[in-house]
């Protein structure tokens, strides 16, 4: 028997980045994948085809760093609470092998010895800033001392005799010999925070990079200084990350001066300078050199594949969301199905549902959370945002234009579109009717707080769900909206509602974990009630077949229900593990799209036996 549901595609979130803080992109010893973190997730992506992704979500707290063991069989990931998890990479389930708490506080970096047997972990613990121990028992194999402030970076020489280096906010790097690892001496060449330390793959050298714009090269075995790259300053801004070439001859650096550079370390000269732009979001916070791939990470969260032959234009740029996705819709355009998603930073992204190729709209868009979106019959994406505007964006152009943003009197939180150029917008304490991108009618003094709205596909009827647990029906009459004086009762405060595509049913979900379906032709009598969610249901979407609909909740679960029989249902547990499901949409009768506060978009194949 086929599984009733199967994950088809995962369009992963971007790395979570912060201005002025370096971000680690972990490499894969086998060369296939790369790793980074966003929120509680570790994202594993295929380096040749980044649309192939896997998301690990077993940390209870925000994860900061994740790195493969040199064997390639395990990944170690560390979070803000000081938990280090070591987990299997060979199985889809990613079974936990070991969990340690080397110190209480944020883990900022970690490093393995080449035999995958020892791990060094550094960060901002309360009683110590680092630890080094055996991977299978947690027994200490030395001490990380010598710093009096948070340690940002650690690395271990991948050839014997082992050496270990650290970089700290005390403006110093430190050098250790071992095992057991013992502090040998401090390197105080830098004048600002040391952000990154890395040994070359052959172990002959290690490099340190700092907020002072300098990179120093040292002997990997003795720790003696060899040179400063560029003679003095390597970059005009702070340097956040460095990564060696596989043959140890060159070094990639990423800087707040909005450039990345390749250095010939032996000749002490710049081979290439990659100018990434002029916007503050073009600051470079991370980098990775793996096989022939050179990756750098911008403050925008975008991942750039650098082109040595054309330094001013990346080969490709991976885009997407780095903040939680709040809403979603889908639309067919020229035979292709596109997914549109909006996040809580105002960013709207569109995705080719087949390939995962994606981009944002050009121009200046929403400046705050996008709360709801829909596509109208004119092929415009209609969106409302906490910036108090409703926007109409032409989907064939995909660029924001100033004249198509309509200012609301109060903050909008939900909208629905209908035939005839109508949009109904719910603002706080107000319902606004718009026609052809203009406000034409408003109802204030509602006596209840409107939360969700749907327009009947035949036009004319509007259903508004309130926090008081009622659904009220209205009629569009020309340029006004009239109450029908008809109220339907949900089982709790209404969170979302939707008409089936044929207009026969209205499904209403509520904060009391229930979905109620009303039959429209029969005067909105209650047709069926659907129980199953363990927490507030927040979103609902009808399949094009009008016989099934999906609901998503704060319990991380998605259900696909059969209208005629509440017992015939498909349950997708942990659709987005540890994160609320925030949006649902159907590409076709058997393909469901889900989005979540984990900033990822997933496609599921649904089959009915």
Curated annotation (Swiss-Prot):
The entry's keywords: Actin-binding, Cytoplasm, Cytoskeleton, Repeat, WD repeat
GO terms for biological process, alphabetical: actin filament depolymerization; locomotion; sarcomere organization
An example Gene Ontology molecular-function term: actin filament binding
Domain of life: Eukaryota
Location of the protein in the cell: Cytoplasm, Cytoskeleton
Keyword Repeat: yes
WD repeat feature ranges: 6-47, 50-89, 95-137, 140-178, 182-220, 226-265, 272-308, 313-353, 360-410, 434-476, 482-520, 525-563, 568-606
Family matches, as Pfam families: WD40
InterPro entries, sorted: G-protein_beta_WD-40_rep, N2O_reductase_N, WD40/YVTN_repeat-like_dom_sf, WD40_repeat_CS, WD40_rpt
Ranges in coiled-coil conformation: none
SMART domains (alphabetical): WD40
Gene3D superfamilies reported for this sequence: YVTN repeat-like/Quinoprotein amine dehydrogenase
Sequence similarity: Belongs to the WD repeat AIP1 family.
Protein name: WD repeat-containing protein 1
Upper taxonomic lineage: Eukaryota, Metazoa, Chordata, Craniata, Vertebrata
